[in-house]
Amino acid sequence: MPESPIRKLAPLAAAAKKRGTKVYHLNIGQPDLPTPREGLEALKNINRDILEYSPSQGYQSYREKLVGYYKKYNINVCADDIIITSGGSEAVLFAFLSCLNPGDEIIVPEPAYANYMAFAISAGAKIKTIATTIDEGFSLPKVEKFEELINERTRAIMICNPNNPTGYLYTRREMNQIRDLVKKYDLYLFSDEVYREYIYTGSPYISACHLEGIEQNVILIDSVSKRYSECGIRIGALITKNAAVRAAVMKFCQARLSPPLIGQIIAEASLDAPEEYYRDVYDEYVERRKCLIDRLNRIPGVYSPIPMGAFYTVAKLPVDDAEKFCRWCLEKFEYEGETVMMAPAAGFYTTPGAGINQVRIAYVLKKDDLIRALVVLRKALELYPGRVDDQ
């Protein structure tokens, strides 16, 4: 089981704080923007004598309300197609456990969210990665590269759109390419779409559920964590029109008893957040993205493509080893009492040596803090003993 590149340096950050150093957390996608008032009010107004189990599939009222939410994105589902999970992570795990046998293979573009690898191991499955590169903005390679990986054990393709960790948004051509592969080889398509609200290019959001001819192959993964700054309530969803898959998933749902009661109450109420809430959050991320990328690419030796969605970017640094650099920042460096914490990007790859000089940065800090964090990062790169200028 691999360590999380997002969390494994947390003890070093804790030690730095204990020494009195301020740490700017660019490592984790924990939004700092407020949870919708509607969700917080629902939490305050809970008045129950018993906090009982909820149904294993999730509350009917919440699932019915989600139908209306998805309809806004032209995702046409019914309440029975939706299974509420303990976060999007459980949805991914249950999808793998329900659709894959030990030894089955999933094709995943890399870099990829590191927990996909961990969940595949839990299911006894194997991740086969297809390379995307920072120099090409993490766009997908040609279909032939996918077909080179497909064999008798291939069961699925997994995508995250918009992408974590890269911020890439798949084009219509790329989504059609994936659809054609899924249809040709009768594969499952696991599609993690938790960042659909955050698309910055004017390009359309194309859900896997929009792809014609593979409706029975698609398993959509969703979560309220990033949409409403509700990471702590652990509410996600698995959505599919495939009744056999739903039946298999429900066995795991019954084994874990129920998704969180309190979390569902908050998540259901949060669906009533006004459009102004979404607009304000979106506008804030637009500003942060511009602030980050403009300043990041002005640091000598640093390069980041412009992320098209989500609130992450992967940046190339002028260092010998990004993980060593991230450790050094927390253990041996501080500038005016401050340092930065980032996620070493090698942990988002399975190919040995890939991403060795890259980091994932989450722009989840207020603009002033983001600007200051980049000042500290620039100074750290100037002083780092393992700096490499010619790459």
Regions inferred by a protein language model and the residue ranges of each:
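Basic nucleic-acid-binding alpha-helical/helix-turn surface characteristic of O6-alkylguanine DNA
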Residues: 49
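Generic structural signal for well-ordered alpha-helical scaffold segments
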Residues: 14, 67, 71, 96-97
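Conserved N-terminal alpha-helix of the aminotransferase class I/II PLP-enzyme fold
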Residues: 53-86
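PLP-dependent class I/II
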Residues: 2, 9, 16-24, 29-46, ...
